Amino acid sequence: MLLAMIGFSLISIASLRKESATKWSKYKLTTPVKRSAIVQSYFLSFLLWLIVGMVFAGIGVALSIMLHGFPFDKDTDVFLLFVMGIGISLFMGGIFFPLFYIGGEERNEVFLVISLLCGIGLVMGLTTLLNTLFPAPMTTMQIILGGAIIFACALLIFVISCPVT
């Protein structure tokens, strides 16, 4: 599930690598479209690929439940896996796009690895923080609240990075 959401998000980022080979990076500067519209299209493409990954992950979960029953310990496990996948993807996109425009296309792969590791680290850090804030046997409501906090932080970083880029 995580691989579907994160993997499909990587598709939109990987497509930026091909810009220099196709000379699009030079051509887009001469078009009558504003730079902000081009940047917003990258963010929108990223979100669309994330949604495609979520759909594939949802289909995978549904098929798994239909064929094997419910393989998770708690009802919230699927929710948390989706929150982690979406959170890592949004953090990754929120970090990658500003780095890409600051550093240029030459270091695209390096920025991709950095943003992926930062996304994973931020989700793990938030999870650790939430585990220390809530008492040890977490209730279902606390788990859902923790997931909502992770999602809200990831979405905030992603939304803030769009105008910054």
State each model region's role.
Residues M1-K23, S41-T165:
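Hydrophobic alpha-helical transmembrane segments of membrane proteins
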Residues L29-R35:
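Short helix-to-coil transition segments within interhelical loops
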Residues A37-V39:
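Alpha-helix N-cap/helix-start motif at helix boundaries, enriched for small hydrophobics
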